[in-house]
From Swiss-Prot:
Protein name per the record: Ribosomal protein uS12 methylthiotransferase RimO
Name of the encoding gene: rimO
Transmembrane segments: none
Keyword S-adenosyl-L-methionine: yes
Chief site of localization: cytoplasm
Amino acid sequence: MKVHLTSLGCAKNQVDSELMLGAFAAEGLTVCDDPAGADVLVVNTCAFIEDAVNEAVDTILALARYKSEGSCRRLIVCGCLPERFGEELAGALPEADFFFGTGAYHRVIEAVAGKESTLSRCTLPPPDAVPMQAAADRRICATPHTVYVKIAEGCDRRCTYCIIPRLRGRQRSRPPADIVVEARGLVAAGAKELVLVAQETTAYGADLSPPVSLASLLMALSDAVGDIWVRVLYMHPDTMDPDLIRVMTERDNLCSYFDVPVQHASDRVLKRMGRRHTAADLHRLFDDIRRADPDAVLRTTVLVGFPGEKPADFEKLLDFITGVAFDHLGAFIYSDDEALSSHGLDGHVSSKTARHRYDRVMTAQIDISSRRLAKRVGSREPVLVEEKAEDGLFFGRAWFQAPEVDGDVCFSGAGDYAPGDRVSVRITGASAYDLTGEAQ
């Protein structure tokens, strides 16, 4: 039997998809890239914001055509969309045969393998009813040299703009020994970069007995994996501490790369968002990081157009962005949804105003990023090769560039470099987000 899986959404969703693909292969099923040739179609969905919901529904309907026009016999929907809408979704999408919430990924294999006699059409246990899945065989969806490792699931916070706790449940951390075992296996299989992800990586281990810290996990991984890059994403300012900063800035194989989404820098807006820190707290945190390592790279995410965001609040955010001078920054426009606590707040910002503020943020960041990247011209940087172009050029990333969200390095060289190779590159040029160079 042939099965095709479409994965939507974030890197954390990608890990769930890779675990399912591993389970399919272990069951003796053939995983195929082309949905037209599959007997069973699976779509792992996202439902974080309205655009993600729309994309998921459109994808399901597009795949459903293979049931009526092709060889597909079964269409299975799993992940955040069924978790959010449940039986309502099943009623609206008769094209799909089975629906599984985020607490039932481990049961998708039953529907795929034709063991559905024990299943109802919708399988929706509480999202946190099942512990984090132990290390298992995965079929890596993207490049085998850069692999995401999910260290925890769920979130205990209640930010008013976020639906994740409802979709993913309370935080559950994986035992550190289990993560180290998986990391060693991935490195043995060819991984050159491990990217740690969770809803909040810096809260890792607080729910374990006895509690452990992200810093202790990173030290164990640093000792275990050798000369590869270990990168951490999705850090929260409230759960960062001096020990974590010290470990990340002192260990050679831990990228001194701090992805800390701040969302805003107006104390009034932060309070409405359900964030517990202040702008002063954020300034102190980033000062501490750069004091520990002046070459540390800072990335953040901000949210503009949040209900009640006044012009003065936005100016505080803009001043904060330019003052800290983040190496990388992503911005989003607030997406209202009746499922959010923020839906009931007053002072909703018009879409025109929100778009204008977004444009101002990104314009400011282009200038900041251009200046910071220009400082790297003339330096020699290790670059992880990701692609060989037909014209003899190569594309890759330096340690200060995370996959998918940051820029890349385009370089020339006489060597026959392959994806996964690490090459010393002299940086010769810089733009707003990307670098050019020559292999040395």
